[in-house]
Amino acid sequence: MGIFSIANQHIRFAVKLACAIVLALFIGFHFQLETPRWAVLTAAIVAAGPAFAAGGEPYSGAIRYRGMLRIIGTFIGCIAALIIIISMIRAPLLMILVCCVWAGFCTWISSLVRIENSYAWGLSGYTALIIVITIQTEPLLTPQFALERCSEIVIGIGCAILADLLFSPRSIKQEVDRELDSLLVAQYQLMQLCIKHGDSEEVDNAWGDLVRRTAALEGMRSNLNMESSRWVRANRRLKALNTLSLTLITQSCETYLIQNTRPELITDTFRELFETPVETVQDVHRQLKRMRRVIVWTGERETPVTLYSWVGAATRYLLLKRGVISNTKISATEEEILQGEPVVKVESAERHHAMVNFWRTTLSCILGTLFWLWTGWTSGNGAMVMIAVVTSLAMRLPNPRMVCIDFIYGTLAALPLGLLYFLVIIPNTQQSMLLLCLSLAVLGFFIGIEVQKRRLGSMGALASTINIIVLDNPMTFHFSQFLDSALGQIVGCMLAFIVILLVRDKSKDRTGRVLLNQFVSAAVSAMTTNVVRRKENRLPALYQQLFLLMNKFPGDLPKFRLALTMIIAHQRLRDAPIPVNEDLSVFHRQLRRTADHVISAGSDDKRRRYFGQLLDELDIYQEKLRIWEAPTQVTEPVKRLTGMLHKYQNALTDS
């Protein structure tokens, strides 16, 4: 396929984007809005953003969700701007500097919250800055300006959502159904690999792939939840299926690890059962039936605990999977599974990374302010706005540098494209609403094609072009103003890029160490006799951290294996029959305190001291378990955990 070719699957979204832009433009001018450009720009960004992220037409609900986030972010930003202006209107420089800090603060929060919701916080940061900069000459018009911006943005979002509904958005339900079947077959094949106890690299690749697919399925669940209220029951089942899928991975990998020291635990009966190849979910269903009969015949005590747990989790997976596909009423048996355990949310391991993002955004905005005041350039405010936009949106993404490059390419492409519209097309079409709408529809259509291909600069070109062409009411054509706006965008993007290059993000290794220590803390916290604490489901949070670790350190198998071993230790100790008495309960609290000190330690020396203390306490704990005659189901996992911590002590304590 050629570089400028148009694929059939890209046409529908391109038409959808063109329709959203035309609707926003028509409504903006029909109702005599002062700046219809904001409505058009909002419609374009809300519609095109999810398509750029997805690399194609987004699924149903994605545009609506992004629109809601934009509304929330805009309102938060407007309220913050009003508070800042009312408090500091007599000190304009201080007011702008506080806005720069606010933009940095919002970027800091957006780096800590879920990535799906980070857009709202990033937007609220630069919205306040836009308002404060725009009203510099007429501060008394702030409330009116904020209200106009909010209303025009809501109109733009409404147009994007309406266009999405008009062109029958894709439902993700069929993809979810197919992935559920495929995932169960892959889980069975992973257990086959683990029982064969073959090549460790093959097993690592298999479970790593399943972790990614389970994370992707959780993302599909979020999309399905946004799509329609009729999928509420399916959404509840999919939440439980996420935990079950992670449980299956954990039990399979533990089966592999057990065979390193005690291969005789896996009997020939189960080895023969798992030798049967499976291709479809029906094959897996038949095999599970056979296994349940064998377990009933041999008895639970004669069945390895990992296999027993795996068969139970796979059976529950099958039951809930049928419910998701049919979307029928939840049965009593399903309700029992769904009411299982409260899911625990884990604290973010990226606090240092978030602080780097805060300084990058704050410093780049302050640098833009100084540049504006020093040069007195009429479009310095435009450069400042672009700095805030780029840094606020780029920081949350895995590669901020590439996002900046995308914006630079986009603003450079917007200069000749905007020039064509400003000098030729708009002056000749402004007397006819039909021709004006058609001219912008053509722009939206062709950029919509490129956005779906994730063409570098396409998203930036769409936003930058709409931002600099004259779409105000009334239209005024001042070439110097157009050139200033276009150059301001380019300079702003370049200044943001320079700051990102200068303020290096060296938090990667620290984040990795914090993540590994959080795995250790989770394993230690599982040693408890508290009934409420034992019922807490930390598995989704732990695998979410493992997924982050895999993204931060691709190909670093020792780190992944260590993290997975800690997850296995957590699950095994959580279910272990620890003797209930006051002596052990007090010591459990001491172990948790020491593990927390390891995570929060500010220096390597403190961390090593607390980690050494934790190892000593674990040795004492093993002695206490011997005194209280704890069963092997408790002593073996604790011994295995202590051995792992001794082995990887340097990796867990050194920065």
From Swiss-Prot:
Gene Ontology cellular component terms for the protein in this record: plasma membrane
Q: Which GO terms describe its molecular function?
A: transmembrane transporter activity
Q: Do the record's keywords include Metal-binding? A: no
Give a yes or no for keyword Cell membrane in this entry: yes
Q: Which compartments does it reside in?
A: Cell inner membrane
Which key words tag this protein in UniProt? Cell inner membrane, Cell membrane, Membrane, Transmembrane, Transmembrane helix, Transport
How is it placed in the membrane, per its record?
A: Multi-pass membrane protein
Q: Which residues cross the membrane?
A: 13-33, 38-58, 69-89, 93-113, 121-141, 152-172, 370-390, 407-427, 431-451, 459-479, 482-502
Tell me, in one coarse class, where this protein mainly resides.
membrane
Give me any GO biological process, just one: carboxylic acid transport
Q: Which cysteines are joined by disulfide bonds?
A: none
- What is an example of a Pfam family matching this protein? FUSC
Enumerate the InterPro entries for this protein: PHBA_efflux_AaeB/fusaric-R, PHBA_efflux_pump_AaeB
Q: What does this protein do?
A: Forms an efflux pump with AaeA. Could function as a metabolic relief valve, allowing to eliminate certain compounds when they accumulate to high levels in the cell.
Q: Which HAMAP family match?
A: AaeB (MF_01545)
Which family does this protein fall into?
A: Belongs to the aromatic acid exporter ArAE (TC 2.A.85) family.
- NCBIfam families in the cross-refs: PRK10631.1
Q: What is this protein called?
A: p-hydroxybenzoic acid efflux pump subunit AaeB
Source organism of this protein record: Salmonella enteritidis PT4 (strain P125109)
